[in-house]
């Protein structure tokens, strides 16, 4: 079982749920207390390291989904 995080898939899911909640990247970034540039990198799967757990927790809370939903690889 591969436990690594697919940053591209994570970013796609965050973007999907953000749009479903009718939020812009700017609004989500502000609510999570991160820069818009970093939010954009997360959604594009361009983060060099994994997204930190506190940031991921904040994103999931704002979007109203579980961290598991964001990280789950739906193969």
PLM regions: where:
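Short C-terminal boundary/hinge segments that cap the last helix of small helical domains
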Residues: 64-75
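Residues within the helices of the helix-turn-helix
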Residues: 15, 26, 57
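A short, Lys/Arg-rich alpha-helix, primarily the initiator
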Residues: 1-20
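Conserved hydrophobic/aromatic packing and binding residues within compact polymer-binding modules
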Residues: 14, 28-29, 39-42, 70
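Short coil turns linking two alpha-helices in DNA-binding domains
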Residues: 24, 35-37, 52, 66
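Alpha-helical residues within the helix-turn-helix
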Residues: 19, 30, 61
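Short, basic-rich loop-to-helix N-cap that marks the start of a DNA-contacting helix
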Residues: 46-61
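Recognition helix of helix-turn-helix/homeodomain-like DNA-binding domains
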Residues: 33-49
């Amino acid at each position: 079982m591969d436990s690594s995080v697919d940053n591209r898939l994570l970013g796609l899911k965050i973007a999907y749920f953000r749009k479903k909640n009718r939020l812009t990247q700017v609004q989500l970034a502000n609510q999570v207390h991160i820069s818009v540039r970093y939010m954009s990198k997360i959604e594009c799967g361009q983060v060099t390291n994994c997204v930190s757990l506190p940031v991921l927790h904040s994103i999931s809370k704002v979007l109203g989904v579980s961290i598991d939903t964001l990280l789950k690889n739906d193969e």
